[in-house]
């Protein structure tokens, strides 16, 4: 196969181009307290397929309301109706809800439509952040989440570093039956990415108040 010449499928912006995303291709969060939540997260309880999940995410984002990515590895794929040119400045903004002491750093990946088919199936590149190459950063981290055996239970997980744990069920705050995405039919699923060295700590000493300090630069939802 002959690769097309660089820039063949470049789509310059014009007067009708949107300033924001144009299409959501996939929404796959990790389990978490906001996943499937009918009250604060806007789920309907009938998101049973990946297509339902995409429709949910598009509806929320069109209304400029957040979507949760859950625990580690959750992701959303958004596309634009034009190419975003790298001018060496700030060309892309991702809004979050962080505040001082509550940063949840999200790593950003970008892709250009090299084959011109309009799908997110070309080469992805991770944008560098302040922790890239730092001691404690794990570049090829993978975590597997397991479907709870019954409603109201924690979500168990294991990773490729030999660790295991759980995402606690916090029914007093988020009482939906499951924190495991309803539209994921498999009994387990694995998410991959770069894991930063954790900075969060229990300021209360009893687990009631956790502080999540920010990282220097390069991450979404990072104060």
What are these regions (language model features)?
Residues 2-106, 123-223:
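A domain-level signal for the mature, folded cores of soluble proteins
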Residues 111-117:
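Short loop/turn segments immediately following beta-strands, especially the blade-tip
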């Amino acid at each position: 196969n002959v690769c097309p010449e660089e820039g063949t499928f470049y789509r310059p912006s014009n007067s009708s181009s949107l300033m924001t995303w144009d299409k959501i291709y996939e929404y796959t969060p990790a389990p978490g307290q906001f996943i499937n939540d009918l009250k604060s997260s806007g789920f309907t309880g009938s998101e049973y397929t990946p297509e339902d999940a995409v429709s949910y995410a598009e509806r929320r984002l069109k209304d400029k309301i957040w979507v949760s990515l859950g625990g580690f590895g959750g992701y959303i794929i958004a596309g634009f109706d034009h190419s975003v040119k790298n001018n060496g400045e700030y060309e892309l903004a991702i809004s979050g809800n962080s505040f001082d002491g509550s940063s949840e750093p999200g790593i950003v990946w970008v892709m250009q439509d090299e084959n011109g088919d309009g799908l997110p199936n070309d080469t992805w590149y991770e944008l560098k952040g302040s922790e890239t190459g730092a001691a404690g950063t794990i570049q090829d981290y993978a975590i597997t989440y397991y479907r709870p055996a019954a409603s109201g239970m924690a979500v168990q997980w294991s990773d490729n570093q030999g660790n295991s744990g759980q995402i606690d069920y916090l029914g007093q705050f988020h009482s939906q039956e499951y924190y495991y995405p309803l539209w994921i039919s498999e009994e387990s699923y694995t998410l991959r990415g770069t894991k930063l060295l954790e900075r969060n700590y229990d300021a209360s000493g009893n687990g009631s108040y956790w502080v999540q300090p920010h990282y220097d630069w390069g991450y979404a939802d990072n104060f």
